[in-house]
Amino acid sequence: MELPFTNLEVAFILLAFFIFSLFTLASIYTSPNERNEDDDFHLKEKRRKRKEFKGKKNCSDEEHKIETMQP
């Protein structure tokens, strides 16, 4: 009985399966918090700067209110 694939094709199929399994296990066993620590730091820094900027406004909130027009 002959195999439907050559030895080279079988080697590539096994290699692809091994790499796919490796990435699957890596995605399962890595914590998303470890990967996003830097992103969280940058988001917190942006929020802090935004709050500081809001506190430094020179104009009042009344100047920025939109008045609705009555027909």
Curated annotation (Swiss-Prot):
Residues spanning the membrane: 8-28
Task: Give the UniProt keywords, A-Z.
Answer: Glycoprotein, Membrane, Transmembrane, Transmembrane helix
Which portions of the chain have biased composition (kind: Basic residues)? 48-57
Q: Its GO CC terms? A: membrane
Where does this protein have compositionally biased stretches of type Basic and acidic residues? 58-71
Q: Where is the signal peptide?
A: none
Disulfide-bond pairs as recorded: none
Q: Where is this region: Disordered?
A: 48-71
Respond yes or no to whether keyword Membrane is given for this record: yes
Localization recorded for this chain is: Membrane
The membrane topology noted for this protein in its Swiss-Prot or TrEMBL record is:
Single-pass membrane protein
Q: Which of this chain's residues carry glycans? A: 58
- Record protein name field: Small integral membrane protein 31
